A protein has these predicted regions:
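Catalytic-loop motifs flanking and including active-site residues across diverse enzymes
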Residues: 3, 39, 43-47, 156, ...
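Residues in well-ordered beta-strands of folded domains
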Residues: 26-28, 94, 127
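Long, hydrophobic, well-ordered secondary-structure blocks that form the structural core
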Residues: 33-85, 92
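C-terminal nucleotide
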Residues: 112-201
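Alpha/beta catalytic cores of group-transfer enzymes, especially the acyltransferase/condensing modules
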Residues: 66-118, 190, 198
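Short acidic, glycine/serine/threonine-rich loops at helix termini
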Residues: 36-39, 87-88, 96-97, 136-140
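ATP-binding N-lobe of GHMP and related small-molecule kinases
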Residues: 1-35, 49-65, 112
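Domain-wide signal for the mature, well-folded portions of proteins, strongly enriched
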Residues: 16, 46, 56, 64-75, ...
């Protein structure tokens, strides 16, 4: 697939051995492709893990910590959400004042700073339409960058992460639900006010 070829080209400098090998990729995913529920995150996380595993064959001293950090770093290049898909159960991606070890390069596991109630959460996804979404993630991100309200959105998101740190520690479900619902509605509001505008729900 074209997206995979572009991804492999981007990461050549981190895996020089790719240039000298033919890579055959066989994958299967229970999520519908490009429907807006992060199928690319799981696929890029899996592919990145395989590549670092391949690298580890020539470096038997590679630590588990380094393995997962590099896999997360590489996965992020293919899909931002993929950086959070390699360990956990609760991972933050992106630098935030709330978490000292957080950064923009790879996901940071915050499970040990999180109340047990959140570790019992599961997703249930009802697929109504398995078709592909009309606006790709990359197109959506581009529209967000040009949105006149994006700067306010970023500031609110930063504040929400700070608030969520205490909420995740305490297990305060009411405030957790309030923030997550507000986040979802705000994202959809930005979509409606982008140019061109679109509806994802």
């Amino acid at each position: 697939e074209n997206k995979t070829r572009i991804f492999l080209k981007k990461i050549e400098k981190f895996f020089p051995f790719i240039i000298n090998h033919d890579i055959e990729i066989k994958s299967n995913n229970t999520f519908p492709h490009s429907s807006g529920i992060a199928s690319s995150a799981s696929s890029m996380a899996a592919l990145s893990s395989c590549l670092v595993d391949f690298e580890k064959m020539g470096n038997t001293t590679m630590s588990d910590e380094y393995f997962y950090k590099k896999a997360s770093f590489i996965a992020r290049i293919g899909s931002g959400s993929a950086s959070r898909s390699l360990y956990g159960p609760i991972v933050i991606w992106g630098e935030s004042k709330a978490y000292k070890t957080s950064n923009d390069l790879f996901g940071t596991d915050i499970s040990n700073q999180t109340h047990d109630i959140f570790k019992e959460f599961n997703d249930t996804i009802l697929i109504i339409d398995p078709g592909q979404k009309k606006i790709s993630s990359s197109q959506g991100h581009e529209l967000m960058n040009k949105n006149p309200f994006s700067s306010q959105r970023y500031e609110i998101a930063k504040k929400n992460v700070l608030d969520l740190k205490e909420i995740l520690k305490s297990g305060d479900l009411d405030h957790f639900i309030s923030i997550t619902e507000s986040e979802a509605l705000m994202i959809h509001s930005l979509m409606l006010t982008s140019n061109p505008s679109y509806i994802l729900m």
